Amino acid sequence: MLDIIFYSAFVSVLIYSIIESAKFIENINIFAVGRRNFSTFSLTMTIVATWVSGSGFFINLTQFYKSGLFYLIPAIFMCFSLLFVSLFIAKRMKPYLGFSSVAAIMGHRYGHKIRVITAIAGAVGVMGLIAVQFKIFASLGSYIWGEYNINPSWYVIFFGSIITLYSSFGGVQSVIKTDIIQAVCFFISIIIAIVVLYLKVDSIPQEILSKVDVSKFHIKSIFQSESDKIWNFILLCVYFLIPGMNPASIQRLTMGFHVDQLRSSWFISFLLLLIVKLTCAYIVYLLYLTNPNLQESQLFPTLINSFEIDGVKAILIIGIISMAMSTADSFLNISAVLIANDTYAYKQSSVKKLSIARKWSFIIGISAIILTFFKNDLLSLLLFANSFYIPIVTVPLLALIFNFKLTERCVIFSMATSFIFVCVCHFIIHVSFEPIMPAMLLNAVVLFTSHYIIEKWELLSRFGITSNLYKIRKSN
């Protein structure tokens, strides 16, 4: 009975927040970055909620259990990417406060072509990230309505539709309000999970616990592994260390009212995310001690079934659903903004763009629901989606933030090269590794080589092609 009460209360609070937020959405700028009057607490909660994510919990659960420190250490590197943003990027965002999207920032420096390319890459990559969040609803729904024997696909459609609706009408203000509710629910749920599992492990006789092989959770397991596994470990560490330059993260950097607020919010978020990662790892470690022979498909059911007190199971499920909804609505909001504000409708009025953004929220939400049925592994789907944004946009975006004076054609050339490389790796030669890091490296090499050889040295002037570098310096 308590489970039903908690589910109903959670949905009711969300609906109320959505209705209240939707009343004050007047144009695309408010839809994208709100009125920029968010408190540091609100900004911190939405950063944490977006970065934790429901899919992140499932990935942490399966990968920590299966790989131990081989996944925990790279996951901790993800936390330090937020610290990097706080220390080195936030203080450089003053010229871009209030910008509606990452594409608007790129277009401001590099031109409209780069703005459109960034918007398309961002929307495509974000669609995959939304699908990752939607996918976990298939598992969660069975614990809410499992007695009715409903096809899991309907859970994806149901929750995906709810998120699509409230993101479409409420804009980022609705996203921020629900993020706070969802983050609080998640923190409560993981505290309860630790207490329940700790008591369960404490009841197991010591002679049984001593026989459990926990070598994968020891640091020496990394140095005693095969070279291929160590190489993949290093690549994953570097990948997670990349600063959070996805469209939703940039949105969190532009909606602040001052750079000091941004630095504080991202630093606190770093600490909270680190606590969450370590806490989730401890939950998995306790789960492993209770049963070290679980299959991947048995992990979450075993965790859920550990909670025998009425209402406790609902709190954990609500916490995970909250994180999935929080991340999905953030990416859904920014993807609609990218298309409405930065592609074909960029010359329309701000009110017209708002209408277009809401329509695209529906289209992207439906597309993400469809995409969930094509890939099963969450980490694989996450990396696949990111491979069409991170290698293409991150390098020129960081160059812009750190005030490198690059020209439009150099950026287009580097973006096109990395995009072709990713497509070849995915669809032609089918490499066994994720091409994100090699593609980023290729992007950087092409970008700065073309800048220093073609633009700065003007070697192409012999062919009648002149450098635009002087124009950029003059305009700045």
Feature roles, as predicted:
Residues 1-476:
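Membrane-embedded helix-loop-helix hairpins and adjacent transmembrane boundary segments
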